[in-house]
Amino acid sequence: MLRRIAPFVFATCALVGCQGGLLSPSASGDPGSSPAGPVTPQEVAGQWSPYVNVHGDGEVLLAYRDALSALQRAGRVQGVRMEIHGNEALNSVIKTVGAMGFEVLGLVSNDYLFEPNIEGVIDRIFSTYPEIRYFQIGNEVTTILPPTGPTITIEQYAALFQRIYQHVQSRHPGRAILVTQSALGSGMRGPTELETLTTLALEHMDPDKVIVAVNAYDPDAVSRYRGLLTGSLRAFRVWVTESGIANPALQAMFVRDRYPQLRQYLRAERVYWFVLWGADSGPDTDFSLIRYPTRYPDYWKSPLFGLLTGQP
């Protein structure tokens, strides 16, 4: 899944990642036990969270503009999560989407985590994207890395996050809110890593300046976070930075039935749908709200997109 994505908001994302980069899902929740029957626009609107992951692909910008404008007119999208890559000086898609009036959560790519002068990196990113207030520092950092490249432990990440936090508070006070890396939403790895991050770093930080992030594709599995989120992290806001299901026919049901669970179990203030477009083939395709964007204006829209926008 997106496994990639300003004053700084450090949010720890606790569920899964994405195609072509940090954003890419690792698990999906099947609402198979939910009541049968069609989902109404009112049911979707009542549970939907107006946030979505967007890949920064300039080749499909016309379709992006069209789809995001439709969602914006319907009042269904207020913000997007987009990845800031280390191999590009500036991403024009991030700039364009931000200029449309959307709040951007900038996901600082995992590639940046190995820069020796991380403070200088942060300074450059702040300068390049002055319009961004929320910045997520990495995504599922211990699992979404090149198989033959460098690796990072949660202990090393905690030290790095603390460096960035201290730099932002001293050099850029009030500039950004930092969002922690996304913790995995399934199994024990995510809760264990978040507990370590809390002990080593978050307990010593201002909850008004940091957001905890979780990637949650299987809401039934996130109950393991409840003790931590109602205990040591009870003062911190929580964002689910990736969620969704890889089945267009079940997307609306997932929003209706699973989004309330994410709010209940995780205290989720926001849920970012994964993803607007996850490529036309591959593991992320069926999470998409649109497909075949190069066919604009005749690109495909998912049933959930239709319910959200009122388009057939």
Annotate each language-model stretch with its function.
Residues L15-Q42:
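Bacterial Sec-dependent N-terminal signal peptides
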Residues Y112-I137, T153-R171, T192-D208, P260-R263:
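An active-site-proximal structural segment forming one wall of the substrate-binding cleft
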